[in-house]
């Protein structure tokens, strides 16, 4: 139950359903999600570790302010350090099953982007969320194939922080097609079996994400 509530609140935070700076009342959230207060309290405590919400002794849980440019730079630097190394290791461990899993993740992302593009002018908040989930799934597939459990744990913490980029953006998703094209380049690089080629493709992707994210940040 806590896992379900966590993801429901995460989606509400990233989509802007819960407004920045507002106090998150456990009783009201429990009523909205039709659950008891306990899983809401547990989910908020977990969300506090991501930086999406913060806890103050007398106010309770509130939505955190958006990332500033220094925080974004630090986060993207962490991505470069972890993800470039991870794809290098995954490339060394590469096998047909891994590439098939990555192709499947990419196909899911492709369909999500197409669905979002066809309906984004009519709202499409849930479709935008599916694009974000599919994007992360692609990266998780790489982490899962490093053969290193600690890298996988680090990836989970990193993914939670990446949601703050979306939360901090001025509006929705603006780079879904760019990210898809870059993921296609990453898969093509992995198919070469050349670690250096794969690492360069990932570094290029992260650099581009950082540049686009800087443009999307609120001042």
Predicted segments, located by residue:
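Short arginine-rich
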Residues: 207-216
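Conserved amphipathic alpha-helical segments that form helical-bundle/coiled-coil interaction surfaces
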Residues: 92, 96-167, 180-189, 197-208
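Short linear motifs at protein or domain termini
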Residues: 1-92, 217-219
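A generic short alpha-helical patch detector that favors 3-5-residue windows
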Residues: 1, 51, 55, 74-78, ...
């Amino acid at each position: 139950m806590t896992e379900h509530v966590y993801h429901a609140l995460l989606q509400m935070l990233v989509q802007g359903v819960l407004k920045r700076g507002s106090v998150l009342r456990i009783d009201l959230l429990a009523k909205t999600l039709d659950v008891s207060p306990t899983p809401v309290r547990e989910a908020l405590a977990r969300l506090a570790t991501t930086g999406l919400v913060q806890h103050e002794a007398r106010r309770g849980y509130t939505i955190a302010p958006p990332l500033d440019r220094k925080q974004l730079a630090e986060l993207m630097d962490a991505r470069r350090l972890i993800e470039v190394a991870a794809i290098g290791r995954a490339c060394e461990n590469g096998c047909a099953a891994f590439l098939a899993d990555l192709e499947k993740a990419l196909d899911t992302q492709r369909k999500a982007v197409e669905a979002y593009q066809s309906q984004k002018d009519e709202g499409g908040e849930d479709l935008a969320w599916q694009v974000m989930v599919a994007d992360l799934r692609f990266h998780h597939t790489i982490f899962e194939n490093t053969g290193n459990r600690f890298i996988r744990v680090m990836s989970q913490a990193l993914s939670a922080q990446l949601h703050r980029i979306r939360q901090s953006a001025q509006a929705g998703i603006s780079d879904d097609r760019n990210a898809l094209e870059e993921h296609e380049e990453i898969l093509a690089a992995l198919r070469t079996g050349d670690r250096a080629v794969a690492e360069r493709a990932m570094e290029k992707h992260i650099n581009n994400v950082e540049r686009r994210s800087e443009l999307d940040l609120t001042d």
